[in-house]
């Protein structure tokens, strides 16, 4: 909680607030950590409440950086901070909106992750020397109309 309070102070001092009421957004979905909206054009906006960051917010920032390293075809861009519908402090993230043919299969995900140098631990969990990727399940990986895979909502952490 202390880190959240420090980040709120940082946001205030640097005027990093995103005024969501000025954006034309359509609600799409809500999960454990994200409220997801579409801008009607080419982007998905996620309000991430840091739920899965644990006690150290650095985990969140590592996750975003590593996601962009391995899954650069659907990168996160953090544009600021806001409060969500439950009045929880959130990072405001933008990702490209993906035109998907379907969800990726477990076999497609496994082949993709192995090509990146990851080893499978479980059907939706992988690791390499430095990182663990989990929740790489079909509902979080899209098979695009272009035939590419898009990892839109996986969890990543430093390997312990």
Task: Pin down the residues of each PLM region.
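Juxta-kinase regulatory segment immediately upstream of eukaryotic protein kinase catalytic domains
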Residues: 1-23
